[in-house]
Design a protein with these regions (language model features):
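A structural boundary/capping signal
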Residues: 1-202
Length: 202
């Protein structure tokens, strides 16, 4: 593994807590999880980490989860409205949003688990997800470049990434259970550390 499960959980909870404070929906916030997660990995682990986005498919204990749009020609694409983001770092695929999957889709009963796999173990196609934990990603570079460019125009994105990196501490170091931040009006707000507990790994 690139990072310990305890540190993965901490990164997920830090980002999740900031999203809740911003009233963003953590279940559809993969851009935040991937961008802030990559920033934390680069800052604290000194690894080259890149957020990627596009089509993503998972076999989660026999439950298939697909982030994609169905095209008129019958194929699926990750360049449309239904896309997903993940992190690629040192040959690993890490999805910091995986513990939020129970909230990501109504009626999806999957436990909150870590997703951290070698990229070399990725299935060869979307149709080859036979075992639990199997995954398939297809990065849509052009579509995601446009999405990220539009998204980064929001001034708070860089601030939140810095707050996330400042809040995170590698285990076994103590991490603050809450932090205080100033909102756009200069008012101080307390953000508690929040998120699902992990139930193992995919």
């Amino acid at each position: 593994m690139l990072i310990k499960q305890s540190d993965y959980h901490r990164i997920y909870r830090v980002i999740n807590s900031l999203l809740l404070n911003e009233n963003a929906d953590p279940a559809t916030a993969s851009m935040y999880f991937s961008t802030f997660g990559a920033f934390i990995l680069e800052h604290h682990y000194k690894v080259k980490a890149k957020p990627k986005g596009g089509l993503a498919a998972y076999n989660l204990g026999g439950t298939m989860l697909l982030f994609a749009d169905h095209r008129e020609d019958g194929h699926v694409t990750g360049a449309g409205e239904n896309f997903h983001c993940w992190v690629e770092a040192d040959g690993w695929a890490i999805d910091f949003m995986a513990p939020a999957f129970p909230q990501a889709a109504d009626g999806l009963s999957v436990p909150p688990k870590m997703f951290q796999k070698p990229l070399s173990s990725m299935a060869s196609s979307i149709n080859d997800l036979a075992q639990s934990g199997d995954f398939f990603f297809k990065h849509e570079a052009e579509a995601m470049a446009q999405r990220f460019a539009d998204w980064r125009k929001h001034g708070m994105i860089g601030d939140l990434a810095s707050i996330a990196a400042g809040w995170f501490r590698k285990s076994p170091k103590q991490m603050q259970s809450e932090i205080s931040v100033n909102d756009s009006n200069g008012k101080s707000r307390t953000i508690p550390l929040a998120g699902n507990m992990l139930n193992g790994a995919w």
